[in-house]
């Protein structure tokens, strides 16, 4: 086999003017083009001049790109954006450092003359809470500090429980094959609902809310499930109710075990775990196994 070094290859490249491939090689290449269903002709690239727009036979100068001007927020909106950024950075590891920055930022907001400043702060905090379940305890600790520091916030203290009690009655379901985008939207709402419930449980732990308020939520979930057990059309909604029951029974376990009502609650779960599916068309094996998982937590 003939071999060439690099210098020889460069020399051949510089001096080569024309070279015809053997017919057999050409045929093979053509066969490849046909198999791949691609063209073997090179399209001519038309060079475009910067000023190549023509109107009425005249060259028109291309309009210069104008960057989008982002309006800079000022006053309370700027401070609220700062608060949102600080809250988003809040994790367990930086709690001590970050909480002081958050408190200072909230003070700056409350110093501003704005009739809606308190509810605006609460809305920023609410948005944080419903989108991150992992740090619910950390968020409740910051919330407790703000409540102790600003008595006026007690007027808005029930906002989280009230909203949970509202959205728990708005559970939806859609088949992903029917509308996948809507299915994803509903899944996000389901996740946010459980995040909010986790935060409420954490608030009970640090005594922002009482256990009776949590018990009211638990009994409400049981009532919703009981009302829908006979309805096959509610089976998917019932599964989401059970997911919420599991959340409160798992994350609120130590709270429940310290209360006398634990016996009634556990008995209720036991009854669900042995329900006959044929007699309860709104119930499913998935829910049944979830109830058994809860019982394992309380052994």
PLM segments and residue spans:
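Intrinsically disordered, low-complexity segments
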Residues: 32-35
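Extracellular/lumenal mucin-like low-complexity stalks
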Residues: 9, 26-29
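Alpha-helical interaction scaffolds
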Residues: 1-4, 14-21, 38, 42-299
């Amino acid at each position: 086999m003939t071999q060439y070094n690099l210098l020889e290859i460069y020399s051949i490249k510089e001096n080569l003017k024309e070279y015809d491939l053997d017919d057999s090689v050409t045929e093979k290449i053509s066969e490849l083009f046909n198999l791949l269903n691609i063209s073997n002709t090179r399209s001519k690239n038309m060079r475009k001049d910067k000023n190549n727009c023509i109107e009425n036979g005249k060259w028109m100068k291309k309009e210069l790109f104008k960057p989008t001007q982002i309006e800079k927020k000022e006053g309370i909106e700027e401070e609220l954006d700062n608060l949102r950024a600080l809250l988003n950075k809040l994790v367990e590891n930086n709690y001590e450092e970050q909480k002081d920055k958050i408190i200072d930022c909230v003070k700056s907001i409350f110093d501003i003359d704005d009739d809606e400043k308190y509810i605006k702060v609460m809305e920023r905090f609410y948005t944080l809470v419903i989108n991150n379940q992992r740090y619910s305890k950390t968020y409740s600790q910051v919330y407790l500090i703000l409540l102790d520091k600003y008595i006026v916030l007690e007027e808005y203290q029930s906002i989280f429980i009230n909203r949970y009690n509202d959205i728990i009655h708005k559970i939806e379901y859609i088949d992903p094959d029917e509308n996948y985008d809507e299915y994803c939207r509903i899944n996000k709402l389901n996740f946010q609902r459980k995040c909010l419930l986790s935060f409420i449980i954490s608030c009970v732990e640090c005594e922002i809310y009482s256990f009776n308020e949590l018990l009211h939520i638990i009994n409400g979930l049981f009532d919703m499930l009981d009302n829908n057990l006979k309805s096959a059309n509610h089976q998917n909604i019932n599964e989401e109710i059970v997911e919420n029951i599991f959340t409160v029974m798992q994350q609120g376990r130590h709270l429940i075990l310290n209360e006398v009502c634990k016996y009634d609650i556990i008995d209720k779960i036991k009854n669900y775990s042995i329900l006959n599916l044929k007699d309860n068309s709104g119930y499913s094996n998935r829910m049944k196994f979830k109830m058994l998982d809860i019982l394992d937590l309380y052994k």
